[in-house]
Amino acid sequence: MVARRVTAKSAPRVAKFRQSSGKLRLRFAEEIAAGTEFELVIRYGGSPRPIRTTWGEIGWEETESGSLVASQPNGAPSWFPCDDTPSAKALYDIIITADDPFIVVSNGDLVSRRAGGSTTRWHYRTREPMATYLATVQVGEFSTFDLGPSTRAWAPAALRERVLNEFAQQQEMVDFFSSLYGPYPFADYQVVITEDELEIPLEAQGLSIFGSKHIKGDHAFERLIAHELSHQWFGNSVGLGEWKDIWLNEGFACYSEWLWAEHKGETTAREAARSHYNVLGRKAQNLTVSDPGARDMFDDRVYKRGALTVHAIHRLLGDAFFTTLRSYLTEHQHSVVEPSMLLDDFRAAAPDAALFDATVDAWLNQKALPPFPN
């Protein structure tokens, strides 16, 4: 996207601006004192398209009958100029004009929907601050299906029965995770199912995006439905300051899968943890979970070892685990955290602080796989 014009409010005039290497550099007509607050208005244009990254092409993508946005971790600049770091949360107004009969689904509340000729203008507004990578726009020929008092699905009409079957327990999931983690942190929860298959589902703030391959009707992907929902607490409401700490998001999301399976009577969280521990034991032990590096940040070992870290802490704290976790999620709702903030809270609640420190260090900072937590 190309910046066309930049103006400032409550600041000297923007004398010159230059855009290169993903940065917009401004020169003001006069010096601005440190600490001065001001507003920038950036007018920009171009054709949204995916960005090539270490992890493949991400960002704005065309689908068979519309478009979608999946920006994690750095695809947001594919459709708007931004400080694309997870710590840069802001309030958003997202306004999209689409040809009829296309439906636009985005983050926050639908403020207005205005028809004009053969197009419709959709205006969404977030109530809570949001990280750039969580901003999304889904465009397609969708129908909407209620899944519960605070949950809704958007999908092509032809997929209705499969969607209602696959997401039949979505509201129960919201209620279950709310009992563990505290009230759901946004006004509602929506899922969008595209006609395209999509390799993996993705979370955005207040909604998640699934492909048609994820709704076979046999509940084979139920764990992923639980995983994406849990990100509304871990990652979306309480966000990361740096991507190196991604285990905090993904570890709790994977652990939530195990807790849901236990809730449904399919297995226990401990049995699920043991199963994944055994798989990890057959893989290379050559990454550090607390800082895996860009190439390995989405490695499944980071996800599962992060979840096993959470399981180990749960075993150490017992009943104090969820009490401490709920307090942390409430205190830091809609803000940005570092892992030490939660780990310090857990340490204070642990019966043996020295054992807690040793356990966390072994799981997060050492490459060798520690013994299974008993």
For each feature predicted by the language model, list its residue ranges:
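An active-site-proximal "capping" alpha-helix that borders the catalytic cofactor pocket
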Residues: I94, F177, N249-A261, L342-F346
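Short helix/loop segments within enzyme catalytic domains
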Residues: W260-G281, A320-L329
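Beta-strand-rich interaction surfaces with strong enrichment in secreted/lumenal proteins
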Residues: R13-A15, R27-I32, W79-D84, D109-R113
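Zinc-dependent metallopeptidase catalytic helix centered on the HExxH motif
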Residues: S87, L207-A272
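A surface-exposed beta-strand-loop module
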Residues: M1-E61
